[in-house]
Design a protein with these regions (language model features):
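Conserved phosphate/oxyanion-binding catalytic-loop motifs
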Residues: 159
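Active-site beta-alpha connecting loops in nucleotide-dependent enzymes
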Residues: 141, 164-183
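Acidic, Mg2+-coordinating active-site environments of NTP-dependent enzymes
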Residues: 2-156, 179-180
């Protein structure tokens, strides 16, 4: 589908069975090799070092300029002091030798990872960190971790999770700030 194309930046957020099917990739090996092909078509790569499979990429493609991000492991763009509520995530990140506070109005640890990836892309493209942090604070995705206001103040969230991994991500996010059952 992309033969002959050259890309500026490739981002590998995580490696899961989301794309294993008759229509996409027959197995995890094929899926990973496809991702490697994409990275070979790019001068710059951005990877989540907290994902074990993804963190292998710099060794496999030493010629690429790889930027790393994460929460738990050593990397170039690292989130610290993370707060996750039922309506947002807030964290500190070091960008261009400055510590910045980042707030994204989509709850869940996955939102921290997505924001870190966006910060890395912006940095590679030469976009000022304050601009990307402003943009992240404005993100609203209808149907994605969307809180529903109601008179009883019961936490109700709409989310379009459509795969086992995305469903697990949102359920983990919700469970972290609720008591009892999550329906």
């Amino acid at each position: 589908r992309v033969a002959g194309c050259q890309f500026d930046i490739a981002v590998f957020t995580n490696f899961s069975e989301d794309h294993i099917s008759e229509k996409e990739h027959p197995d995890m090996k094929d899926y990973f090799e496809s991702k490697l092909k994409l990275f070979k078509m790019c001068d710059n790569g951005i990877i989540n070092v907290d994902d074990l499979q993804v963190s292998k990429i710099p060794r496999l493609l030493p010629e690429n300029k790889i930027m790393t991000y994460g929460i738990d492991n050593y990397c170039e763009v690292l989130a610290k002091d993370i707060t996750i509520t039922n309506s947002y995530v807030d964290f500190r990140v070091k960008v261009s030798d400055r510590n910045e506070r980042v707030k994204v109005d989509i709850p869940g640890r996955f939102s921290v990872y997505n924001a870190l990836a966006a910060i890395c892309v912006a940095k590679k493209l030469g976009i000022a960190s304050d601009k990307v942090i402003e943009a992240l604070a404005e993100i609203k995705v209808p149907g994605r971790s969307e809180m529903v206001p109601n008179k009883k103040e019961i936490p109700i969230m709409i989310d379009y999770a459509h795969s086992p991994e995305s469903l697990q991500n949102i359920l983990s996010a919700v469970k972290s700030y609720t008591r009892g059952r999550v329906i």
